[in-house]
């Protein structure tokens, strides 16, 4: 048994040698003792080693099919966009992590090709074009969760050129660093999603002598970080000044996904695609409104919309999303893993109450979202308004077993049906 000096009653840790008076706790084993400080040190060592093992597992890159399947579990519709994103993201992280991302002997095979040794693969940032509420942001968030990389969302409308009132573009990078818990190395392999990118389009198609600090000026400021540069970021955000320290982050391996609704872009696409005749006698090929979709977009359309050529050139992957149909919006409510209806059913079950939505109610919720023109984004606020009175009352009652929502309830023409708990128990007993 571990002792100190002449004192038979003074015990010490068998690992660090500290006496029981020098530590808070001494735990006894068969002939040995360990103090609380050594236990804490052991836990840190174990966590560090497990963390390194987890990081090693994360280097195995999922295939485009696996990425697509993951998106399918959470996002309804937009199959073309999901396939395009899966391939683009796979190629990006394959470029970042190298051949070891796929395992096997690929690294050895690559070194055998002398003609490819000095080839540098360029970065492929992504531009997503589509109406509001169609799932652009959610697609990017789901991608980042699957790849387990830091993810930051920025709003392009708040950005201005350096020296003007508003946010510098470097503040976008600060959000990514914060999402990585200030681990710059981890942040350098993250994803930045910039929304409302169409709001920084050039105010005029022709260059102007007047300064456009929130439009073309922001596009110019974004060019370097999109392409890849070592940026200096103020750790607390805000404007730069010479007497502060900066965080240095290399954006060469940061994947940028920029997105916007691009209202009016369909008219630009239509004017290009719908008039193919040349000369006075040539027939004009008129297209109807339904014949033009975002999927027909080309770089020259974005140029005419107001994006500068250099900015478009740094976004080589262009993918489009379309308005969700009525049936797809109903599926958004019920089918994904984190479906809105499932979320509310879980919340109600925490109070011991089942929640049921009739098919007519789901259709009514979607009809209201379509009337507002907000797409899937408006579904939660409609559900919240419908269920708010019930959610206020239920925690105070213990006699309710099930709440049934009909279409009339959603339309404000009736009250929810409350089935007593006893009736619900008997009903479940018969079905069992």
Swiss-Prot record:
Q: Which UniProt keywords apply?
A: ATP-binding, Chaperone, Metal-binding, Nucleotide-binding, Zinc
Q: Which CDD domains match?
A: RecA-like_ClpX
Keyword set includes Nucleotide-binding = yes
Q: Which GO terms describe its cellular component?
A: HslUV protease complex
List the Pfam families hit by this protein, alphabetically: AAA_2, ClpB_D2-small, zf-C4_ClpX
Question: Can you tell me which residues bind Zn(2+)?
Answer: 13, 16, 35, 38
The record places domain ClpX-type ZB at 1-54
Any one Gene Ontology BP term: proteolysis involved in protein catabolic process
GO MF annotations for this entry?
Answer: ATP binding; ATP hydrolysis activity; ATP-dependent protein folding chaperone; protein dimerization activity; unfolded protein binding; zinc ion binding
Which amino acids does the record list as binding ATP? 131-138
Q: Which domain of life is it from?
A: Bacteria
Q: Does the keyword Chaperone apply?
A: yes
Q: In UniProt terms, what function does this protein have?
A: ATP-dependent specificity component of the Clp protease. It directs the protease to specific substrates. Can perform chaperone functions in the absence of ClpP.
What interactions and quaternary structure are annotated?
Component of the ClpX-ClpP complex. Forms a hexameric ring that, in the presence of ATP, binds to fourteen ClpP subunits assembled into a disk-like structure with a central cavity, resembling the structure of eukaryotic proteasomes.
Similarity comment: family membership: Belongs to the ClpX chaperone family.
- This chain's protein is named ATP-dependent Clp protease ATP-binding subunit ClpX
> What lineage is on file?
Bacteria, Bacillati, Actinomycetota, Actinomycetes, Micrococcales
């Amino acid at each position: 048994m571990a002792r100190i000096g002449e004192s038979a009653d003074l015990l010490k840790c068998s690992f660090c040698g500290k006496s029981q008076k020098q530590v808070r706790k001494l735990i006894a084993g068969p002939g040995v003792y360990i103090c609380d400080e050594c236990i804490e040190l052991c836990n840190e060592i174990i966590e560090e080693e497990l963390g390194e093992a987890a990081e090693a597992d994360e280097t195995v890159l999922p295939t485009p099919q696996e990425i697509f399947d993951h998106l399918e579990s959470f996002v309804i519709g937009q199959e073309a966009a999901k396939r395009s994103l899966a391939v683009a993201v796979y190629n990006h992280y394959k470029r970042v992590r190298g051949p070891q991302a796929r395992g096997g002997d690929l690294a050895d095979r690559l070194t055998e090709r002398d003609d490819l040794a000095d080839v540098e693969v360029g970065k492929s940032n992504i531009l997503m074009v589509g109406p509001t509420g169609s799932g652009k942001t959610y697609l990017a968030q789901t991608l980042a969760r699957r790849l387990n990389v830091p993810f930051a969302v920025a709003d392009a409308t708040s950005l201005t050129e350096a020296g003007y009132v508003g946010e510098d573009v470097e503040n976008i990078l600060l959000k990514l660093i914060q999402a990585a818990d200030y681990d710059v190395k981890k942040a350098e392999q993250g994803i930045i999603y910039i929304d409302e990118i169409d709001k920084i389009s050039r105010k005029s198609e022709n260059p102007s002598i007047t300064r456009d600090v929130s439009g073309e000026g922001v596009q110019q400021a974004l060019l370097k970080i999109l392409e890849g540069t070592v940026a200096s970021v103020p750790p607390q955000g805000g404007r730069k000044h010479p007497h502060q320290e900066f965080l240095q982050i290399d954006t060469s391996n940061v994947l940028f996904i920029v997105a916007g609704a691009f209202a009016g872009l369909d008219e630009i696409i239509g004017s290009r695609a719908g008039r193919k005749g040349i000369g006075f006698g040539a027939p004009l090929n008129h297209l109807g409104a339904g014949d033009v979709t975002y999927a027909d977009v080309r770089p020259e359309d974005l140029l005419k919309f107001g994006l500068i050529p250099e900015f478009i050139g740094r976004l080589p992957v262009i993918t489009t999303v379309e308005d969700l149909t009525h049936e797809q919006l109903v599926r958004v409510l019920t089918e994904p893993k984190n479906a809105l209806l499932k979320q509310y059913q879980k919340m109600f079950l925490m109070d011991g109450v089942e929640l049921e939505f009739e098919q007519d109610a789901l259709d009514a919720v979607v009809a209201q979202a379509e009337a507002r023109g907000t797409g899937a984004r408006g579904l939660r606020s409609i559900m919240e308004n419908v269920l708010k009175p019930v959610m206020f009352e239920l925690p105070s009652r213990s006699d309710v077993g099930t709440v049934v929502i009909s279409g009339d309830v959603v339309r404000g023409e009736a009250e929810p049906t409350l089935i007593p708990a006893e009736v619900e128990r008997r009903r479940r007993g018969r079905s069992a």
